[in-house]
Amino acid sequence: MTHRCLLQMVLLLCFSTTALSRSYSLLRFQQRRSLALCQKLLRQLPSTPQHCLEARMDFQMPEEMKQAQQFQKEDAILVIYEMLQQIFNILTRDFSSTGWSETIIEDLLEELYEQMNHLEPIQKEIMQKQNSTMGDTTVLHLRKYYFNLVQYLKSKEYNRCAWTVVRVQILRNFSFLTRLTGYLRE
Protein backbone atom coordinates (compact mmCIF):
# COMPACT_ATOMS: atom_id res chain seq x y z
CA MET A 1 0.00 0.00 0.00
CA THR A 2 2.75 2.42 0.97
CA HIS A 3 4.75 1.61 -2.16
CA ARG A 4 1.76 2.30 -4.38
CA CYS A 5 1.13 5.68 -2.71
CA LEU A 6 4.78 6.53 -3.03
CA LEU A 7 4.78 5.58 -6.70
CA GLN A 8 1.67 7.70 -7.30
CA MET A 9 3.30 10.67 -5.58
CA VAL A 10 6.47 10.30 -7.64
CA LEU A 11 4.47 10.08 -10.87
CA LEU A 12 2.40 13.09 -9.86
CA LEU A 13 5.53 15.10 -9.13
CA CYS A 14 7.11 14.09 -12.44
CA PHE A 15 3.93 14.94 -14.34
CA SER A 16 3.49 18.29 -12.63
CA THR A 17 7.14 19.21 -13.25
CA THR A 18 6.76 18.35 -16.94
CA ALA A 19 3.47 20.22 -17.17
CA LEU A 20 5.01 23.26 -15.52
CA SER A 21 8.06 23.10 -17.75
CA ARG A 22 5.79 23.22 -20.76
CA SER A 23 3.81 26.19 -19.53
CA TYR A 24 5.52 28.93 -21.47
CA SER A 25 2.98 31.50 -20.30
CA LEU A 26 3.85 30.85 -16.67
CA LEU A 27 7.54 30.87 -17.52
CA ARG A 28 7.17 34.16 -19.41
CA PHE A 29 5.40 35.70 -16.42
CA GLN A 30 8.08 34.48 -13.98
CA GLN A 31 10.91 35.65 -16.21
CA ARG A 32 9.44 39.11 -16.79
CA ARG A 33 8.88 39.65 -13.08
CA SER A 34 12.36 38.44 -12.26
CA LEU A 35 14.07 40.44 -15.02
CA ALA A 36 12.34 43.62 -13.84
CA LEU A 37 13.60 42.95 -10.31
CA CYS A 38 17.15 42.32 -11.59
CA GLN A 39 17.12 45.62 -13.49
CA LYS A 40 15.83 47.42 -10.41
CA LEU A 41 18.61 45.90 -8.28
CA LEU A 42 21.30 46.82 -10.82
CA ARG A 43 20.04 50.39 -10.96
CA GLN A 44 20.36 50.64 -7.17
CA LEU A 45 24.12 50.26 -7.47
CA PRO A 46 26.13 53.52 -7.51
CA SER A 47 26.06 55.20 -10.90
CA THR A 48 28.85 56.07 -13.29
CA PRO A 49 31.56 58.47 -12.16
CA GLN A 50 32.17 61.03 -14.91
CA HIS A 51 35.82 60.04 -15.41
CA CYS A 52 34.75 56.48 -16.24
CA LEU A 53 33.26 57.61 -19.53
CA GLU A 54 36.78 57.40 -20.97
CA ALA A 55 36.90 53.70 -20.10
CA ARG A 56 33.91 52.83 -22.29
CA MET A 57 34.31 50.05 -24.79
CA ASP A 58 32.06 49.00 -27.61
CA PHE A 59 31.21 45.41 -26.79
CA GLN A 60 29.21 44.15 -29.71
CA MET A 61 26.25 42.02 -28.75
CA PRO A 62 25.85 39.25 -31.35
CA GLU A 63 23.94 40.48 -34.40
CA GLU A 64 21.25 37.81 -34.08
CA MET A 65 20.26 39.32 -30.72
CA LYS A 66 19.22 42.49 -32.51
CA GLN A 67 16.57 40.54 -34.41
CA ALA A 68 15.11 38.59 -31.52
CA GLN A 69 11.81 38.10 -33.35
CA GLN A 70 13.48 35.44 -35.50
CA PHE A 71 13.93 33.10 -32.53
CA GLN A 72 11.68 30.12 -31.98
CA LYS A 73 10.70 29.73 -28.34
CA GLU A 74 13.10 26.79 -27.94
CA ASP A 75 16.00 28.89 -29.24
CA ALA A 76 14.93 31.77 -27.01
CA ILE A 77 15.07 29.45 -23.97
CA LEU A 78 18.63 28.37 -24.83
CA VAL A 79 19.76 31.96 -25.34
CA ILE A 80 18.04 33.29 -22.21
CA TYR A 81 19.53 30.51 -20.10
CA GLU A 82 23.03 31.15 -21.45
CA MET A 83 22.78 34.89 -20.86
CA LEU A 84 21.57 34.44 -17.29
CA GLN A 85 24.34 31.96 -16.59
CA GLN A 86 27.02 34.24 -18.02
CA ILE A 87 25.73 37.29 -16.13
CA PHE A 88 25.66 35.23 -12.94
CA ASN A 89 29.27 34.14 -13.51
CA ILE A 90 30.42 37.72 -14.13
CA LEU A 91 28.75 39.03 -10.98
CA THR A 92 30.51 36.44 -8.83
CA ARG A 93 33.86 38.05 -9.63
CA ASP A 94 35.78 40.58 -7.52
CA PHE A 95 33.69 43.75 -7.36
CA SER A 96 35.23 45.03 -4.11
CA SER A 97 36.64 48.17 -5.79
CA THR A 98 33.16 49.35 -6.78
CA GLY A 99 31.65 50.23 -3.43
CA TRP A 100 28.61 48.17 -4.45
CA SER A 101 26.38 46.75 -1.76
CA GLU A 102 27.08 43.05 -1.21
CA THR A 103 23.45 42.61 -0.21
CA ILE A 104 22.22 43.95 -3.55
CA ILE A 105 24.65 41.72 -5.45
CA GLU A 106 23.59 38.70 -3.38
CA ASP A 107 19.91 39.47 -4.06
CA LEU A 108 20.70 39.85 -7.75
CA LEU A 109 22.59 36.54 -7.83
CA GLU A 110 19.75 34.82 -6.00
CA GLU A 111 17.23 36.14 -8.52
CA LEU A 112 19.40 35.03 -11.46
CA TYR A 113 19.80 31.59 -9.89
CA GLU A 114 16.02 31.28 -9.49
CA GLN A 115 15.47 32.22 -13.13
CA MET A 116 17.97 29.59 -14.26
CA ASN A 117 16.22 26.99 -12.08
CA HIS A 118 12.89 27.78 -13.76
CA LEU A 119 14.48 27.43 -17.19
CA GLU A 120 16.74 24.45 -16.59
CA PRO A 121 14.21 21.59 -17.06
CA ILE A 122 13.08 23.04 -20.39
CA GLN A 123 16.62 23.89 -21.44
CA LYS A 124 17.77 20.31 -20.79
CA GLU A 125 14.78 18.91 -22.66
CA ILE A 126 15.52 21.12 -25.67
CA MET A 127 19.20 20.18 -25.62
CA GLN A 128 18.31 16.47 -25.65
CA LYS A 129 15.86 16.81 -28.56
CA GLN A 130 17.69 19.16 -30.89
CA ASN A 131 21.01 18.65 -32.58
CA SER A 132 21.69 22.06 -34.07
CA THR A 133 19.62 25.20 -33.85
CA MET A 134 19.97 28.89 -34.36
CA GLY A 135 20.08 29.07 -30.56
CA ASP A 136 23.25 26.97 -30.53
CA THR A 137 25.02 29.37 -32.88
CA THR A 138 23.86 32.36 -30.91
CA VAL A 139 25.04 30.73 -27.67
CA LEU A 140 28.54 30.41 -29.14
CA HIS A 141 28.52 34.09 -30.13
CA LEU A 142 27.25 35.02 -26.67
CA ARG A 143 30.05 33.08 -25.00
CA LYS A 144 32.57 35.10 -26.99
CA TYR A 145 30.81 38.34 -26.03
CA TYR A 146 30.86 37.46 -22.32
CA PHE A 147 34.44 36.21 -22.56
CA ASN A 148 35.36 39.67 -23.86
CA LEU A 149 33.58 41.30 -20.91
CA VAL A 150 35.51 39.13 -18.46
CA GLN A 151 38.80 39.80 -20.25
CA TYR A 152 38.07 43.52 -20.08
CA LEU A 153 37.48 43.30 -16.32
CA LYS A 154 40.69 41.32 -15.87
CA SER A 155 42.74 43.71 -17.99
CA LYS A 156 41.48 46.61 -15.90
CA GLU A 157 42.11 44.61 -12.71
CA TYR A 158 38.43 44.75 -11.79
CA ASN A 159 38.60 48.49 -11.12
CA ARG A 160 35.55 50.63 -10.50
CA CYS A 161 35.41 52.10 -13.99
CA ALA A 162 35.63 48.69 -15.65
CA TRP A 163 32.78 47.44 -13.48
CA THR A 164 30.77 50.53 -14.37
CA VAL A 165 31.20 49.75 -18.07
CA VAL A 166 30.24 46.10 -17.52
CA ARG A 167 27.24 47.11 -15.40
CA VAL A 168 25.92 49.18 -18.33
CA GLN A 169 26.41 46.17 -20.62
CA ILE A 170 24.50 43.93 -18.20
CA LEU A 171 21.65 46.45 -18.05
CA ARG A 172 21.49 46.33 -21.87
CA ASN A 173 21.48 42.54 -21.64
CA PHE A 174 18.40 42.67 -19.45
CA SER A 175 16.65 44.69 -22.16
CA PHE A 176 17.48 41.94 -24.67
CA LEU A 177 16.35 39.30 -22.17
CA THR A 178 13.03 41.07 -21.65
CA ARG A 179 12.46 41.20 -25.40
CA LEU A 180 13.38 37.53 -25.80
CA THR A 181 11.07 36.56 -22.94
CA GLY A 182 8.20 38.07 -24.91
CA TYR A 183 8.65 35.29 -27.49
CA LEU A 184 7.87 32.55 -24.96
CA ARG A 185 4.30 31.97 -26.08
CA GLU A 186 2.34 28.72 -25.94
Curated annotation (Swiss-Prot):
What biological process terms from GO does the record include? adaptive immune response; B cell activation involved in immune response; defense response to virus; humoral immune response; natural killer cell activation involved in immune response; positive regulation of biosynthetic process; response to exogenous dsRNA; T cell activation involved in immune response
Signal peptide (residue range): 1-21
Q: Which Pfam families match?
A: Interferon (PF00143)
Question: Where located?
Answer: Secreted
Q: List the disulfide bonds.
A: C52-C161
The question of whether Endoplasmic reticulum is a record keyword is answered with no
Query: Please, which domain of life does this record's source organism belong to?
Result: Eukaryota
Keyword list (alphabetical) reads:
Antiviral defense, Cytokine, Disulfide bond, Glycoprotein, Secreted, Signal
GO cellular component annotations, sorted alphabetically? extracellular space
Glycosylated residues, per the record, are N131, N173
Q: A GO molecular-function term, please?
A: type I interferon receptor binding
Major localization listed first in the record, in broad terms? secreted
- Subunit field text: Monomer.
In terms of PANTHER family, this protein maps to: INTERFERON BETA, TYPE I INTERFERON
Q: Which family does it belong to?
A: Belongs to the alpha/beta interferon family.
* Function field: Has antiviral, antibacterial and anticancer activities.
Q: What is this protein called?
A: Interferon beta-2
Gene name of the record: IFNB2
